[in-house]
């Protein structure tokens, strides 16, 4: 599968007198239809990277290719039309008096016909389960509902790429999981490419690959399973240790023959059943 995003030796500084570059020769690619999670401590360069991809910042050196086109000043708006951004605080994105108005805002700015706007708005709200709230004021919604509306606004623009910048971090665990599942369903149905900056294990577990950033560089890329198998190293990367990994570690320390590495809850359940049956 071809790459829809590619960064080649990208370097960026916010200030000329910085001791270390904010990004230092960053190179990676994202495949069409892939879900890539980007993790790392604060200051590792995660948010800077996605702002460069969206053309909100300009690299000092290196190149960024989006959907086959080199990102430049002349085509930055064309590139942005291919990308939907959802941020940590949805209140910063709302501009409409009602949910329906807000989702329609970007479409109206593109000069899309009224009937097409109505159809796209209704479809996007249906995808995120918010069609019954379209006459509501965004300020009166819960945190999870606000993020669903923000996602609907992005999806209505029919982007090829959706970027989530800590989009689930302000939600409670239930709301976070529901939102992640909604994003997964939309991604699967429409073959969208998803880039997610996150510290949430459930979000990371659903991704195809995980890119770890450290001190403005790419520390590693791996599958979620390979990442979770790193055990205590996860704490140094800004993640918790998955519950199943902690259980596996405890069993191994007690001498039980459990497979090393990350297991899903179902896989761990199967292993425990096998152990019990042999006792």
Curated annotation (Swiss-Prot):
Cell compartments where the protein resides: Cell membrane
Major subcellular site: membrane
Keywords tagged on the record: ATP-binding, Cell membrane, Membrane, Nucleotide-binding, Translocase, Transport
Mode of membrane association: Peripheral membrane protein
Presence of keyword ATP-binding: yes
Gene3D superfamilies: P-loop containing nucleotide triphosphate hydrolases (3.40.50.300)
GO molecular function, one term: ATP hydrolysis activity
GO annotation, cellular component aspect: ATP-binding cassette (ABC) transporter complex
EC code(s) of this entry: 7.-.-.-
Signal sequence segment: none
Domain of life: Bacteria
Binding site for ATP: 40-47
Stated role: ATP-binding (A) component of a common energy-coupling factor (ECF) ABC-transporter complex. Unlike classic ABC transporters this ECF transporter provides the energy necessary to transport a number of different substrates.
Family: Belongs to the ABC transporter superfamily. Energy-coupling factor EcfA family.
NCBIfam families, per the entry: ECF_ATPase_1, PRK13635.1, PRK13648.1
PANTHER family xrefs: ENERGY-COUPLING FACTOR TRANSPORTER ATP-BINDING PROTEIN ECFA1, HEAVY METAL TRANSPORTER
Assembly behavior: Forms a stable energy-coupling factor (ECF) transporter complex composed of 2 membrane-embedded substrate-binding proteins (S component), 2 ATP-binding proteins (A component) and 2 transmembrane proteins (T component).
Protein name: Energy-coupling factor transporter ATP-binding protein EcfA1
Upper classification of the organism: Bacteria, Bacillati, Bacillota, Bacilli, Lactobacillales
